[in-house]
């Protein structure tokens, strides 16, 4: 029969192994969550931004962004805000032109409206116009990939991307 000291050591080893296994499971789950695509209804993807980009619209959106978004996404949208390290998955880098060119305004509006852990929903906190204003602001953080040089390269078959042949 094991002594109390042996039982205690065995119990500690089992608890340590269990804790280690749990940490591994959480990390694997979180890694898969990071790359999980947003499921956005098709009709929402097709929505066009009804808000006109004016100086006052962008100024208002900038104020909302600084109050509600910059803590995680960073002042310039790089996903490097002071609270970014506390979240897993990390906040999106809104300056990533490739990523931003893959999503429609409707998708960005949906993401702001609905949220997804750890990002909160802003549907009840902000009006539709405020959320559409944020879409305009978020779009301004990245440079569109479609430039005259890219259009010309695609036209002559030198660029590869969606809709181009390899």
What are these regions (language model features)?
Residues 5-23:
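N-terminal Sec-pathway targeting helices
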Residues 27-57, 70-95:
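His/Cys-centered metal/cofactor-coordination and adjacent catalytic loops
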Residues 73-79, 98, 113, 123, ...:
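Detector for the c-type heme attachment site
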Residues 37-64, 148-149, 156-157, 161, ...:
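Electrostatic cytochrome c docking/interface patches
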Residues 90-106, 121-131:
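Electron-transfer interface patches adjacent to heme c in soluble/periplasmic c-type cytochromes
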Residues 25, 110-111, 123-157:
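C-terminal capping alpha-helices of c-type cytochrome domains
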Residues 67, 89-91, 114-117, 129:
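Extracytoplasmic
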Residues 55-78, 84, 108-114, 134, ...:
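Sequence/structural segment immediately N-terminal to covalent heme-attachment motifs in c-type
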């Amino acid at each position: 029969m094991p002594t109390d000291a042996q039982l205690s050591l065995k119990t500690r080893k089992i608890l340590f192994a269990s804790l280690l296994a749990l940490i591994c499971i959480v990390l694997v789950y979180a890694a898969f969550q990071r790359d999980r695509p947003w499921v956005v209804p098709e009709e929402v993807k097709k929505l066009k931004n009804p808000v006109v980009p004016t100086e006052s619209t962008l100024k208002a959106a900038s104020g909302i962004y600084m109050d509600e978004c910059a803590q995680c996404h960073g002042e310039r949208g790089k996903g490097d805000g002071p609270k970014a390290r506390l979240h897993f998955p990390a906040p999106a880098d809104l300056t990533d032109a490739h990523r931003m060119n893959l999503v429609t305004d409707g998708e960005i509006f949906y993401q702001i409206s609905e949220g997804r852990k750890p990002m909160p929903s802003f549907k009840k906190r902000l009006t539709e116009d405020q959320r559409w204003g944020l879409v305009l602001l978020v779009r301004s953080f990245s440079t569109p990939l479609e430039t005259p040089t890219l259009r010309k390269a695609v036209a002559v078959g030198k660029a590869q991307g969606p809709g181009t042949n390899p």
